[in-house]
């Protein structure tokens, strides 16, 4: 016997007041993820996903647009306060933080969580152009 069609349940949006913005700024791209305090992702955006391709992905403006998109998507959860974790040496570090501030979030702290080796792996060879 066929099961009756299950009614689609309304997805309940949880309200989160405090969150963490993780900004991963590499030399090629910038990834902005906004999570709650437990680390569950609320929204994310990248420079490449925001319409930038090639060398334009690694610009501060592309990072700014990615941070704005992630910030606007996370506003639906009622987010007010953010702690910002910045990782990586990329050019979009500062502009992404400024864009989140412009979205209306109260930024409590900015932390640099870039992993620093204690003389671990050998770095890539220097470029010869």
From Swiss-Prot:
Family annotation (InterPro entries): Ribosomal_uS11 (IPR001971), Ribosomal_uS11_bac-type (IPR019981), Ribosomal_uS11_CS (IPR018102), Ribosomal_uS11_sf (IPR036967)
Keyword Ribosomal protein set for record: yes
Keyword Ribosomal protein tagged: yes
Disulfide bond annotation, renumbered to this chain: none
Highest taxon of source: Bacteria
Pfam families xrefs: Ribosomal_S11 (PF00411)
Any one GO molecular function term: structural constituent of ribosome
Any one GO BP annotation for this protein: translation
One GO cellular component, as annotated: ribonucleoprotein complex
Keywords for the protein's UniProt record, in alphabetical order: Ribonucleoprotein, Ribosomal protein, RNA-binding, rRNA-binding
HAMAP family (UniProt xref): Ribosomal_uS11 (MF_01310)
Subunit structure: Part of the 30S ribosomal subunit. Interacts with proteins S7 and S18. Binds to IF-3.
Similarity-based family: Belongs to the universal ribosomal protein uS11 family.
Function: Located on the platform of the 30S subunit, it bridges several disparate RNA helices of the 16S rRNA. Forms part of the Shine-Dalgarno cleft in the 70S ribosome.
Name assigned to this protein: Small ribosomal subunit protein uS11
